[in-house]
């Protein structure tokens, strides 16, 4: 259904973004790619006021399919766009967090974490509980894709305890989102899903 929507009917990519998210959670990367291929080059997610290069999501879908070459090509295209974006506006928290995810997709962990942390400094949850939670969730994703399970779990715990973060982080979402597959065997992550109130570290 989503892939059948013509690009002209989705000029800002909002429908493409929602369709991608549904396909992602249903573990249907081929459907996700079909949706993005028909959509615009820049999309907008409901939880992010700023633009997102569709190439970043395309890279995510290719990585889920195990096609590392195509994934790297897409992540690198997103990187170039986002680096230009934060050069133009160094205070763009969303731009920094999406850039961090593109670095993580390229295996550039130190740069990914640095960019993700910069985003949380620019837009902490203390300043904007809703949009700041989205930025913080992306940092958790960067951590897990960079192999840092403990910091990822600490952030997830903080978000689960927040009344303003339910739209980006819930036990139900964590259970079905493929993003977290690589840490499902981790004892702290298992405990988090069973009892999100159990202490297990401090989020940055």
Task: Describe each PLM feature range.
Residues 1-204:
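Alpha-helical protein-protein interaction modules
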């Amino acid at each position: 259904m989503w892939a059948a929507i013509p690009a002209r009917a989705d000029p800002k990519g909002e429908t493409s973004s929602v369709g991608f998210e549904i396909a992602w959670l249903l573990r249907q990367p081929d459907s996700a790619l079909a949706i993005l291929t028909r959509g615009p080059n820049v999309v907008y997610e409901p939880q992010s006021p700023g633009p997102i290069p569709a190439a970043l999501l395309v890279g995510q879908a290719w990585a889920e399919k195990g096609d590392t070459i195509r994934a790297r090509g897409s992540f690198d295209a997103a990187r170039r766009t986002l680096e230009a974006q934060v050069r133009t506006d160094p205070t763009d928290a969303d731009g920094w967090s999406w850039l961090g995810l593109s670095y993580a997709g390229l295996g550039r962990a130190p740069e990914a974490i640095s960019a993700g942390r910069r985003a949380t400094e620019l837009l902490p949850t203390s300043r904007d509980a809703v949009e700041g939670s989205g930025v913080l969730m992306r940092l958790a994703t960067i951590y897990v894709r960079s192999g840092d399970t403990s910091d990822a779990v600490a952030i997830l715990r903080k978000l689960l305890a927040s009344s303003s973060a339910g739209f980006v982080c819930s036990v139900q979402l964590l259970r079905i989102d493929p993003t977290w597959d690589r840490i499902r065997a981790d004892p702290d992550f298992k405990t988090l899903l069973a009892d999100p109130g159990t202490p297990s570290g401090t989020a940055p």
